[in-house]
Amino acid sequence: MSKKFTKAVLSAAMAGVLFGVSFDIMAAEQSYSALNAQNGAGSIYKVYYNPDNKTAHIDWGGLGDVEKERNKPIPLLSKIDGNGNVTITSADGSTTFTVYDKEVHDFMKAAASGKTDDIKTNLLTEQNIRDLYNRVSAIQQMETNVGLDEYGNVAVTPNEIKERVSLQRYLAWESANSTIVANELEAQKGKLDAQKGELEAQKKNLGELTTRTDKIDAAAAATAAKVESRTLVGVSSDGTLTRAEGAKNTISVNDGLVALSGRTDRIDAAVGAIDGRVTRNTQSIEKNSKAIAANTRTLQQHSARLDSQQRQINENHKEMKRAAAQSAALTGLFQPYSVGKFNASAAVGGYSDEQALAVGVGYRFNEQTAAKAGVAFSDGDASWNVGVNFEF
């Protein structure tokens, strides 16, 4: 890949020719035109270098490939630092990448030195910029996503994938679903606490009622002991039975026992009703306990799904870094230059903690036509490319 690049700096005081390249100064930026296939000043790309912060950006020139974008910035090549790194953001906005380019690095260092000879030696070509644009465009289109099976769960194997959704969308859905389950569980716990309180109140009432029936049973026993000696009992104004002595109203002992039995029957009925309510409350508690157990299992299933999703995310991240390393290695392969000759080249590339090795061959048929092919390997994965170049 040629390192030639035409620098143009237009001066407000003069317009001259230096090394066959015109140049100008606009504000603090210096503009450069990429060399075309004839090693002359091209009109497809313009590079603007800022000597103050040692950064650069590449714009379309007056004869850019897309007519409506001519003389406008190229978004993917708008952030270049002093070391030749291009910063881009993935298509889904989730990840920022830094792509290194050797030719851009050499040019940035030469431009920073301000030495004309160094700049002339490290000039870029239009082909350099095309290759760089293709690399960053391919990386920018990468999107971290999650594969789902037909039931909406994270797919275990590629064959089970029925749908792909962005990672942010899937995590938002899982978070909302987990919140709903947690809220339902909390509501069930609140109802259970309320029922427990009601049960305690019923138990207290039952205890008080039992005390009253014990007293009534004692009174009945005392009355039965005196039946043989007394045939009458007194009846007070509130309907209770008293000793016949001194009472205004009296009834037979048998009638008194019947009246007393009716009262105890009503008490027994009240106790039975309370027992029924206690039984229903106990059943409700058991039902709620089962619901809590079911919700607990649901939460455990969600936890397992999140663990599976995290493993998938980690694998996608590793695969992305291997792909970036392979892309970097393939970019380092050289294109054949001499007509009628084969060339073989090898290159290494890396991204983050992943590395890749690439090998390739090429053949130039004539001055205008050349072809090359390459393959890159990284941790068991492989990627390849084949290209044909026509110059006209």
UniProtKB/Swiss-Prot annotation:
Coiled coil (residue ranges): 174-215
Disulfide bonds: none
Induction conditions: In strain ECOR 9 expression is greater at 37 than 27 degrees Celsius and increases upon entry into stationary phase (at protein level). Upon expression from a plasmid in strain AB1157 (with its own leader sequence) more protein is seen at 37 than 27 degrees Celsius (at protein level).
Span list, region Surface exposed passenger domain: 28-301
Ranges that cross the membrane: 342-352, 355-366, 369-378, 382-392
Any further remark recorded for this protein: Encoded in an Atlas prophage region of strain ECOR 9, upon UV treatment bacteriophage containing this gene can be isolated.
Region (Saddle domain): 231-256
Record protein name field: Immunoglobulin-binding protein EibA
Extracellular-side positions: 28-341
Signal peptide residues on this chain, from the entry's feature table: 1-27
UniProt function note: Binds (in a non-immune fashion) to the Fc portion of human IgG but not IgA; binding occurs on the cell surface. Confers the ability to survive exposure to human serum exposure. Binds to the Fc portion of human IgG and to whole mouse antibodies also via Fc, binds more than 1 Fc or IgG.
Region (Translocator domain): 342-392
Domain characteristics, as noted in the entry: The signal peptide, cleaved at the inner membrane, guides the autotransporter protein to the periplasmic space. Then, trimerization and insertion of the C-terminal translocator domain in the outer membrane forms a hydrophilic pore for the translocation of the passenger domain to the bacterial cell surface. Trimerizes to make a lollipop-shaped form which consists of three domains: a C-terminal membrane-anchor domain, an extended coiled-coil stalk domain which binds IgG Fc, and an N-terminal head domain.
GO biological process: protein secretion by the type V secretion system
GO cellular component terms, A-Z: cell outer membrane; cell surface
Compartment annotation: Cell surface; Cell outer membrane
Subunit note: Homotrimer; can probably form mixed heterotrimers in vivo. Will form mixed heterotrimers with EibD; these are correctly located in the outer membrane and bind IgG Fc, although less well than homotrimers. Does not form trimers with distantly related YadA from Y.enterocolitica; coexpression was lethal and one of the genes is eliminated in vivo. If the full translocator domain (299-392) is exchanged with that of YadA ('368-455'), will form heterotrimers with YadA and vice-versa.
Chain positions covered by the region annotation Left-handed coiled-coil (LHcc): 257-322
Organism of this sequence: Escherichia coli
UniProt xrefs under Gene3D superfamilies: 6.10.250.1980, GSPII I/J protein-like
Gene that this polypeptide is encoded by: eibA
Keywords: Cell outer membrane, Coiled coil, Membrane, Protein transport, Signal, Transmembrane, Transmembrane beta strand, Transport, Virulence
Family: Belongs to the autotransporter-2 (AT-2) (TC 1.B.40) family. Eib subfamily.
UniProt-annotated stretches for the region Outer membrane translocation of the passenger domain: 299-341
Stretches the record annotates as Right-handed coiled-coil (RHcc): 187-230
Main location: other
